[in-house]
């Protein structure tokens, strides 16, 4: 059975690139434009991994991670940050919120697939 990955980013172009890359590698992909949309979608869709941007309107990536981690069913859900932020302080905030890993944009498609395979198979 295919693994399902949720990609959360306010940039349609970025969601399209991530989705294209992961679908090409055999994953199902669910998209959300911000953290609030992601929370709504994840309530009705089982996902094996969340890949989220940091800076988004309505609900940012750190808030999304904290809210997901507060739900018992999602405490161990792998969550990757995919963002332009490369600052060590931001990475520390991400880890403290519960992020599993961090990938800096622009991303290398092969590296993204490799990380996703390591994290969720």
Please tell me what each predicted stretch does.
Residues 2-13, 18-22, 50:
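Conserved acidic segment of CheY-like receiver
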Residues 26-33, 41:
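Short hydrophobic/Thr-rich beta-strand motif most characteristic of the beta2 strand and flanking loop
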Residues 45-51:
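Active-site beta3 strand of CheY-like receiver
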Residues 53, 83:
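Active-site residues of response regulator receiver
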Residues 56:
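Receiver (REC) domain active-site loop signature in two-component systems and cognate sites
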Residues 100:
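Short, glycine/charged-rich "phosphate-handling" switch motifs in NTP-dependent
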Residues 107-116:
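C-terminal output helix
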């Amino acid at each position: 059975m295919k693994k399902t990955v949720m990609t959360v980013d306010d940039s349609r172009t970025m969601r399209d690139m991530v989705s294209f890359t992961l679908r090409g590698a055999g994953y199902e992909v669910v998209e959300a434009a911000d953290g609030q949309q992601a929370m709504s979608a994840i309530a009705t869709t089982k996902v094996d991994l969340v890949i989220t941007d940091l800076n988004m309107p309505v609900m940012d990536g750190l808030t999304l991670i904290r809210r997901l981690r507060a739900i018992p069913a999602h405490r161990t859900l792998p969550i990757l940050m995919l963002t332009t932020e490369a600052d060590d302080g931001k990475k520390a905030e991400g880890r403290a919120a519960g992020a599993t890993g961090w990938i800096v944009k622009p991303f290398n498609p092969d590296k993204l697939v490799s990380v996703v395979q390591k994290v969720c198979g």
